[in-house]
């Protein structure tokens, strides 16, 4: 068969395979066109689940007579004109394929009128060449699209359509998602002549709850927690259900990027990760969230149905969503600070600044007067999307690019000081990181500790250590008097069976990890390096709590904890590396109460080592269950950084097992 150009109708039908999956796909494409045209009212009529009729009527700007023919042509659009427009899309549609694809698999009629025209015009395409016929019609300002007999000329596609009830259920879900995206638009949905849904316009935020309740139900409203966060050009707002409500709402996930409904895996993963400690694997979070981002930083042209996007700063977006949702969930269940307010005498509760209950969100921008994205002050509508290239987001610069390296630095911190694995510098310090990477001071300090405290050196607090003869050293983890010996196996959740001093011993991995954290958190003379948080956490504190922070500001700074105190609130801006993966809200809450106990006694000072040990007891373990290799790595780190602990392990860490009773039980002679 020779190469030939496909007829227009066949080419459009091929394109329709991606655009028109089912009647709900048609409704989505046509309603999004109405929104791009600036419509404030949209009426949707469906017959027989969309197989017989889909009618979309709006009061938008309309299409002029001269453009009706182009409107039904392939790759014809008023949304974009240049590559710059494609890289900063602010409209719902932009490919110019929807109307041509739909008209190729149905009998489509387009009727429209602009405010400048005295009469309306109607267009429809038919035949092998999809020739467009235009004739006068009666119609108010706006557009009406009628799609009759969907898939009438493609029997194979029509055969795969489901029942009328199933297809209408999908249409109803699409309308619900669109109604949640645009509260300012009134939408009605009829099926077989009956009014099914009616969403009245909610021009201000005080009326949002009514539509939210109509779509998501009373259960979601009862358990909804408001989210409102901003970081640079990233903004997220909406509602998430607390874990109790999420368990009752398994199919309540609505997410929007620049008012475009999404089913993006990165977004879902970030939200799911925020819930991970509060929901089981078979449960799903419930949320209605709106993410606004610079259009230059997101590519929506990656999915045929535009259900997925690609973020240029994917990690930044993921962490932003994760921390916003996690902070709100933690706030809902955060305990009090254990202190009382001098004014009221009541317990002071920990309050996140980005909760409505905590007052105004100081990260938020001034409120807008409409519900459209403020990209350069332009409202997306037909024929104006090309102005997006002049958006105010042109100066977007991502912050803290070195954040992605923190995991590598943390791994480098815990690497064993093996002479074969890394080179020593002139000072004898072992640092297994590239030469061009900036090493945090605490890493250098801890590396120095491992070399200043060799295994055969007696620690000051280890005078009671065993004086048994040293066993031959076969390997770093072989049985020896100055080590933990060899890890034989691991018993869930956190116990390791060791070959220790030619005997058997059971070791608590969680206790060993706590001692290791205490050493890592003990500051040197230079102090621990502060690692900036992606999103500073703001706290509303009482005068007594602010005085606690002010009195111990130097101590906290030495630990790498950067707290900015201003007026009646404080902002947590940075923490040391070992604390970055912790629940900072609960940890700082307990820390203020701990420091307050010392402030009541003027002569008593907080010792850094004691504070490091206290914080280590409050940290959550990084491992839910330990593997054999993880246990070996942990003990190697403890032997290297805490040699005195390996020489004289406390009873809470290691327990010698008496195997003589087992041997006697096995003797039957």
Curated annotation (Swiss-Prot):
One term under GO cellular component: mismatch repair complex
PROSITE patterns: DNA_MISMATCH_REPAIR_1
Source organism: Pectobacterium carotovorum subsp. carotovorum (strain PC1)
CDD domains, sorted: HATPase_MutL-MLH-PMS-like, MutL_Trans_MutL
NCBIfam families: mutl, PRK00095.1-1
Biological role: This protein is involved in the repair of mismatches in DNA. It is required for dam-dependent methyl-directed DNA mismatch repair. May act as a 'molecular matchmaker', a protein that promotes the formation of a stable complex between two or more DNA-binding proteins in an ATP-dependent manner without itself being part of a final effector complex.
Polar residues composition-biased segments: 448-468
Gene Ontology molecular-function annotations: ATP binding; ATP hydrolysis activity; ATP-dependent DNA damage sensor activity; mismatched DNA binding
Matches recorded under SMART domains: DNA_mis_repair, MutL_C
Record-given protein name: DNA mismatch repair protein MutL
Any GO BP: mismatch repair
Matching InterPro entries: DNA_mismatch_repair_CS, DNA_mismatch_repair_MutL, DNA_mismatch_S5_2-like, HATPase_C_sf, MutL/Mlh/PMS, MutL/Mlh/Pms-like, MutL_C, MutL_C_dimsub
Keywords: DNA damage, DNA repair
Region (Disordered): 354-402, 448-479
Cystine connections: none
